């Protein structure tokens, strides 16, 4: 658990009620003193740690709750929704997200061959992990660099290396290593998710994705669901609906036009699935 003192020190040096892109590479912080929802984001490979408050994440039909003792590990790009139900000025919500630098993790494994054991062990992908004291301390030191920005250039990368080391040597090490290990299920599924993001508005069969990943059809489907918490169809549908919402809400496109542009053949089916996913009809997002 992060101390009240640490939270107060951070709140003095980061912007309030917005997503803050830190000068520390790959690090983002989000503060809020009121509840809010995020209805469609692509979470890149990262760890996300709630410093204060609680966060709910929705993946398909599953809901995960994260607090300051349990953090989120996202090994591949995953579309997700979420909600912060409780936040107020006296008890604000504060979360950090740190993108995982695959190259840095690979270098640590190359320099320490003994860490490369049991790469496949517990290869389950998206996960909720306990935040142990050694990892918490490293994260705390990284965040408090914001008090002395001149230290960031030299110290931030060193502390991030320590964070990767703690993840590699912790109880979750096998799953974390699978991200960067050639031949691991996580690495293969990452290829499929990348392809889906590039071709989400096309008709794609699961057989095509399985062949692309070099896996059997049944094996691919099983591991895709384990690693992303979504089926391939749910994953593609999430990408389509999120892009459609952006087209409607931000670009002012018509509902039917957006439906066809993201790959739907039936506007009525699109409207039904949009309402089921976001909780309201597409017209609720029109300008």
Report residues per predicted region.
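Short, Lys/Arg-enriched, Trp-marked, Pro/Gly-tolerant hinge/linker segments that flank
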Residues: 117-133, 145-202, 207-213, 226-234, ...
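A short, N-terminal "cap"/entry segment at the start of jelly-roll beta-barrel domains
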Residues: 1-23, 36, 119-123, 145
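Terminal helix-turn-helix DNA-binding modules in bacterial transcription factors
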Residues: 193-198, 202-215, 225-268, 280, ...
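A generic hydrophobic-segment detector
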Residues: 113-143, 259-263, 270, 277, ...
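N-terminal regulatory/effector-sensing and dimerization cores
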Residues: 19-117
């Amino acid at each position: 658990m992060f101390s009240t003192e640490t939270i107060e020190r951070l709140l003095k040096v980061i912007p309030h009620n917005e997503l803050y892109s830190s000068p520390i590479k790959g690090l983002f912080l989000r503060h809020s003193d009121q509840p809010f929802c995020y209805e469609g984001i692509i979470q890149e490979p990262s760890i996300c740690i709630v410093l204060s408050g609680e966060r709910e994440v929705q993946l398909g039909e599953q809901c995960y709750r994260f607090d300051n003792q349990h953090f989120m590990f996202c090994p591949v790009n995953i579309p997700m929704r979420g909600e912060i139900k409780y936040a107020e000025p006296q008890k604000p919500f504060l979360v950090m997200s740190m993108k995982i630098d695959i190259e840095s993790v690979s270098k640590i494994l190359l320099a320490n061959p003994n860490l490369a054991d049991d790469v496949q062990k517990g290869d389950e992908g998206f996960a909720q992990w306990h935040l142990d004291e050694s990892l918490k301390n490293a994260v705390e030191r990284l965040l408090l660099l914001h008090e002395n920005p001149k230290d960031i250039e030299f110290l931030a990368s060193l502390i991030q290396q320590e964070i990767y080391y703690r993840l590699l040597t912790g109880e979750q090490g096998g799953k974390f290593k699978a991200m960067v290990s050639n031949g691991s299920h996580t690495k293969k599924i990452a290829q499929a998710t990348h392809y889906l993001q590039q071709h989400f508005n096309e008709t794609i069969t699961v057989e095509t994705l399985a062949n692309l990943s070099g896996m059997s059809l049944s094996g691919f489907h099983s591991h895709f669901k384990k690693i992303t918490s979504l089926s391939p169809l749910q994953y593609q549908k999430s990408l389509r609906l999120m892009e459609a919402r952006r087209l409607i809400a931000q670009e002012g496109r018509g509902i039917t036009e957006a439906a066809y542009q993201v790959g739907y053949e039936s506007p009525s089916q699109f409207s039904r699935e949009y309402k089921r996913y976001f909780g309201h009809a597409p017209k609720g997002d029109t300008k």
